[in-house]
Amino acid sequence: MRKIILCSPRGFCAGVIRAIQTVEVALEKWGRPIYVKHEIVHNRHVVDKLREKGAIFIEDLQEVPRNSRVIFSAHGVPPSLREEATERGLIAIDATCGLVTKVHSAVKMYAKKGYHIILIGKRKHVEIIGIRGEAPDQITVVENIAEVEALPFSAQDPLFYVTQTTLSMDDAADIVAALKARYPQIFTLPSSSICYATQNRQGALRNILPQVDFVYVIGDRQSSNSNRLREVAERRGVTARLVNHPDEVTEEILQYSGNIGITAGASTPEDVVQACLMKLQELIPDLSIEMDLFVEEDTVFQLPKEL
């Protein structure tokens, strides 16, 4: 009998929960409007619900009236933006994920020590923009092995590397291997800068791939970690679709006869997962459902001190 295999863990991580709660509690405490720099997390469903409650999402701090409260998103911001907020008299509340903050701190520390930092990630992603702002003259962003091969440094230069927290572990490992081959002296943090939730969701998906021939990744197309989940499946030869609404679960699935895997990005609400699951069961009524637990998660991040 065909079955749906639900990955666990999936969906919201501790950093996303903290960021969403930061906006919700701020609205409860101070009322609307509360301004938020960038989407608080990369998921349209989450952003739309918070907008209905009174959050105003902006990209330019000039859009925020003086002396208003502004929340920085989970992805982090460059120091220059914090300075701009202070200069404009804004009351800033920081919802940056603690694991992103850890990368910022490491970059700042090693830049002060004279190291050049190789930052592995998508250079246009808001997280990378924020990290790069810590030491723009001492950071080089690389997205792939070809860019590693084009780096101008010598085997004597002091080099340190970190990664975007939401990268594919597969891709990051390949890039790191290329870096170490060229620069044996390069080093990083004692623990990976790819966050625990990214590692767990990718690990949970890899765990079920031998049992399925099709995967739905429930997540927003703007979500880095959701896109990386899709790539994890495709890299291992399993067809994967990134969907963010049950309407995107289509009769295409009827072309496949094997088991179906379902996972969700770290910014995806569980009610969206369940809605997509119901649509799938409508299309294929005799599917059974099995949960595949990869690891338990119990990480909790405290809300910002202002709340």
From Swiss-Prot:
This is 4-hydroxy-3-methylbut-2-enyl diphosphate reductase. Binds 1 [4Fe-4S] cluster per subunit. Its EC number is 1.17.7.4. [4Fe-4S] cluster binds at C13, C97, C195. It comes from Chlamydia trachomatis serovar L2b (strain UCH-1/proctitis). GO terms for biological process: dimethylallyl diphosphate biosynthetic process; isopentenyl diphosphate biosynthetic process, methylerythritol 4-phosphate pathway; terpenoid biosynthetic process. NCBIfam families: ispH_lytB (TIGR00216), PRK01045.1-4 (NF002190). Isopentenyl diphosphate binds at H42, H75, H125, S223, S224, N225, S267. The lineage of its organism: Bacteria, Pseudomonadati, Chlamydiota, Chlamydiia, Chlamydiales. The active site is at E127 (proton donor). Dimethylallyl diphosphate binds at H42, H75, H125, S223, S224, N225, S267.
